[in-house]
């Protein structure tokens, strides 16, 4: 699989995070290496770039792209291992960290990865092929109550219970093994009137299953907790999100770093020990321009938030 990936908010992210050409920067979501390539173009010979990706194909692509560049360190690992990996590489602290939380276009477009509801393929959705839990396992073996909660919580799918009822009935007859089979089940479950409105009827269900299979939100929370420890004072973290669940986690985490007092108003003196660890570089998230959205419709829902360690 070749990575032909259109990077979102490229200049805005790199301009906001990379400020010291001799610094060490971490791309936690290497993907097609679009952000990493631009970061490298901004670094001097003393600068360093660390790229994380749990997909071995992304690592292979980056090895080919950056072959022979001594500034580049590639880690075939989920970014949940950020702090441990940087310690083992003896690269702490770092001057910047960036995350692009969108599924890379090759993963969406290559049918065999099983992420897309637009192409029929094996029902998979694993970012890391070594992950024992696939979407096929989850759909065929997950309890109905758990599946309904996943679709509602991670996909905000209002037809979650009805979709799961149809899934349970279908899997009684035979295992659901392909994306096409699952799409057909979802279409049968959602009333015709509702299917004609809004996005593709399978979009929310596929998003929810992908998040659950890869524990995306849990991994993000744990990684952000590490980021603030990994950054040098003045270092920045930039995070691009693509849906409200991710953005809420980033917003709440950044706000928790501001050190605002949480004591009741009746307390004359702060007792909670609040201490500011970071500041927001921009009060509101940065959004793609109309021109970028026109050129790359997948950018439409992107939001960029940047924080700076004090």
Curated annotation (Swiss-Prot):
The keyword Cell membrane does not apply. It is found in: Cytoplasm. SUPFAM superfamilies: Putative methyltransferase TM0872, insert domain, S-adenosyl-L-methionine-dependent methyltransferases. Pfam families: Methyltransf_5 (PF01795). Keywords: Cytoplasm, Methyltransferase, rRNA processing, S-adenosyl-L-methionine, Transferase. Its main location: cytoplasm. This is Ribosomal RNA small subunit methyltransferase H.
């Amino acid at each position: 699989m070749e990575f032909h990936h259109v990077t979102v908010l490229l200049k805005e992210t790199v301009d906001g995070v990379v400020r010291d050409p001799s610094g060490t920067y971490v791309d936690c979501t290497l993907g097609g290496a679009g952000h990493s390539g631009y970061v490298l173009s901004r670094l001097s010979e003393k600068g360093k770039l660390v790229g994380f990706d749990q997909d071995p194909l992304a690592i292979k692509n980056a090895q080919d792209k950056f072959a022979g560049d001594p500034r580049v360190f590639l880690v075939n690992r989920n970014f949940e291992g950020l702090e441990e990996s940087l310690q083992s590489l003896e690269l702490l602290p770092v001057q910047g960290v960036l995350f692009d939380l969108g599924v890379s276009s090759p993963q969406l477009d290559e049918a065999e990865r099983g992420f897309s509801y637009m192409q029929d393929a094996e029902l998979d959705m694993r970012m890391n092929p070594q992950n024992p839990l696939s979407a096929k396992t989850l759909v065929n073996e997950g309890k109905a109550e758990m599946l309904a909660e996943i679709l509602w919580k991670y996909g905000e799918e209002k037809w979650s219970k009805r979709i799961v009822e149809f899934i349970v009935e279908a899997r009684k007859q035979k295992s659901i093994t392909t994306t096409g089979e699952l799409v057909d089940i979802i279409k049968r479950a959602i009333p015709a009137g509702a299917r004609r409105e809004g996005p593709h009827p399978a979009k929310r269900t596929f998003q929810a299953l992908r998040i659950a299979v890869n524990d995306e939100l849990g991994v993000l929370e744990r990684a952000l907790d590490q980021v603030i420890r990994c950054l040098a004072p003045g270092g920045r973290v930039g995070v691009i999100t693509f849906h409200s669940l991710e953005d809420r986690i980033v917003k709440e985490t950044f706000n928790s770093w501001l050190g605002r007092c949480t004591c009741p108003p009746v307390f004359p003196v702060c007792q909670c020990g609040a201490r500011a660890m970071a500041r927001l570089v921009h009060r509101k998230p940065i959004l793609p321009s109309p021109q970028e959205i026109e050129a790359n419709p997948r950018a439409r829902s992107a939001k960029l938030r940047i924080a700076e360690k004090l």
